[in-house]
């Protein structure tokens, strides 16, 4: 224990993990931060081992994946851990973001923390797309072609930008080399952002379910919450390894087990399941340029949350109307994902458009309006000393 507090390197570990003061009332939803750390470590380690055997060449990329699966000792486990780990990484991120929205973790004094988190999320999406292209199956090839071709919608420079990304006039060796290099490099940029995220967290401390200051009631992270995290780790690995060993291809497109062929178009080009909601928003807007803007805006719109939420109350536990619309938003997000997995035909296109409208309306109109309503009710109740707010909160 003395070494933990005297050694300059171990002191950081001690301050951030062992003796870090945490609110005494945080729930298991706060486990997802540490679970994301576990997912990130899994992706880094398995990714390094996969890179040792992968060949970024359009003629050999698919074969090198098969070589990893068939000839490398335990290569299939490493590949399935990396592929399924990406899906679990995003699932944990979505729950982590939902927790932040529900408990108001984006509000002052944690605006910097939230901003870095959104940037991390955006970078994760880019890294995930780059990795999706590398196996160079049918879905990888056509996904790369379609998604990168969206840049052509940018006025004046669009076509030149697409050719610059491809390194040619079509997806070629130059493209897959660039994607592989960036897919290997960007996780280390992501690691730097994660460190910034932890610094921001350490500066103001964790939020808590009540959304109030917990300075008077904090306890050390270890052993009280580290053991709580161990329960989360065990549950996570139980589910994760079930997918890895028993249903490793459940979340994988079957077309990606066919070598990429630029002369044959798949019946449907869809991204990984964790990007489907944003793909739906892209597809729901008929104009190509506006669709691209809408897709990017759907990701970056989380940045405006600290500024549009004007409610005097932080936590949704005490905001019954916000709670109702939050659950509607979650269901709407799942609907967007479901629509993205279906063909662009009626009635899916109409449902996707209405869901996309609600998605943006939630951030731009509903949250500010709810803040005005809640502040008005709060001031009336405080002035008249009536139990109406208490009644509504328990009824809803």
UniProtKB/Swiss-Prot annotation:
User: What is the annotated quaternary arrangement, including any partners?
Assistant: Fungal cytochrome b-c1 complex contains 10 subunits; 3 respiratory subunits, 2 core proteins and 5 low-molecular weight proteins. Cytochrome b-c1 complex is a homodimer.
InterPro entries xrefs: Cyt_b/b6_C, Cyt_b/b6_C_sf, Cyt_b/b6_N, Cytb/b6-like_sf, Cytochrome_b, Cytochrome_b_C_euk/bac, Cytochrome_b_N_euk/bac, Di-haem_cyt_TM
Q: What is the lineage of its organism?
A: Eukaryota, Fungi, Fungi incertae sedis, Zoopagomycota, Kickxellomycotina
Function (record text): Component of the ubiquinol-cytochrome c reductase complex (complex III or cytochrome b-c1 complex) that is part of the mitochondrial respiratory chain. The b-c1 complex mediates electron transfer from ubiquinol to cytochrome c. Contributes to the generation of a proton gradient across the mitochondrial membrane that is then used for ATP synthesis.
Q: What family does this belong to? A: Belongs to the cytochrome b family.
What is an example of a Pfam family matching this protein? Cytochrome_B
Q: How is the cofactor bound?
A: Binds 2 heme b groups non-covalently.
**Can you cite an annotated GO cellular component?**
respiratory chain complex III
Query: Required cofactors, per record?
Result: heme b
Name of the molecule in the record: Cytochrome b
Q: Which residues does heme b b566 bind?
A: 96, 197
Binding, a ubiquinone: 202
Spell out the molecular function terms from Gene Ontology: metal ion binding; ubiquinol-cytochrome-c reductase activity
Q: Looking at the keywords, is Lyase present? A: no
Task: Indicate how the chain sits in the lipid bilayer.
Answer: Multi-pass membrane protein
């Amino acid at each position: 224990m003395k070494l933990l507090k005297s050694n300059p390197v171990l002191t950081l570990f001690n301050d951030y993990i062992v003796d870090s003061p945490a609110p005494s009332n945080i729930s298991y939803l706060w486990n997802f931060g540490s679970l994301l750390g576990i997912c990130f470590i899994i992706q880094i380690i398995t990714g390094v081992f996969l890179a040792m055997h992968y060949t970024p060449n359009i003629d050999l990329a698919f074969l090198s994946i098969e070589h990893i699966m068939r000839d490398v000792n335990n290569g299939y486990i490493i590949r399935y851990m990396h592929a399924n780990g990406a899906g679990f990484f995003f699932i944990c991120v979505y729950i982590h973001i939902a927790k932040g929205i529900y408990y108001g973790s984006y509000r002052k004094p944690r605006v910097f923390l939230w901003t870095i988190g959104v940037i991390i999320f955006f970078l994760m999406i880019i890294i995930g797309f780059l990795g999706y292209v590398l196996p160079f199956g049918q879905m990888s090839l056509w996904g790369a072609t379609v998604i990168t071709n969206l840049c052509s919608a940018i006025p004046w420079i669009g076509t030149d930008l697409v050719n610059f990304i491809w390194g040619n006039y079509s997806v070629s060796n130059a493209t897959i080399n660039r994607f592989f290099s960036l897919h290997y490099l960007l996780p280390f940029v992501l690691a730097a952002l994660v460190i910034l995220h932890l610094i921001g967290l350490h500066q103001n401390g964790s939020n808590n379910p009540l959304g109030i200051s917990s300075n008077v009631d904090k306890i050390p992270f270890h052993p009280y919450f580290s053991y709580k995290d161990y329960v989360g780790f065990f549950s996570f690995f139980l589910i994760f390894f079930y997918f890895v060993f028993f249903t490793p291809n459940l979340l994988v497109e079957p077309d990606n087990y066919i070598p990429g062929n630029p002369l044959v178009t798949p019946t449907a080009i869809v991204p990984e399941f964790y990007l489907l909601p944003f793909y739906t928003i892209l597809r729901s807007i008929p104009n190509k340029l506006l669709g691209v803007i809408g897709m990017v805006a759907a990701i970056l719109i989380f940045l405006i949350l600290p500024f549009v939420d004007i409610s005097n109350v932080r936590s949704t536990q005490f905001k019954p109307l916000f709670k109702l619309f939050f659950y509607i938003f979650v269901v709407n997000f799942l609907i967007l994902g479901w629509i993205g997995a279906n063909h662009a035909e009626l009635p899916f296109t109409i449902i996707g458009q209405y869901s996309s409208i609600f998605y943006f309306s939630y951030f731009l109109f509903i949250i500010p309006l709810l803040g005005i309503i809640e502040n008005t009710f709060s001031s009336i109740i405080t002035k008249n000393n009536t139990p109406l707010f208490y009644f509504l909160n328990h009824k809803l």
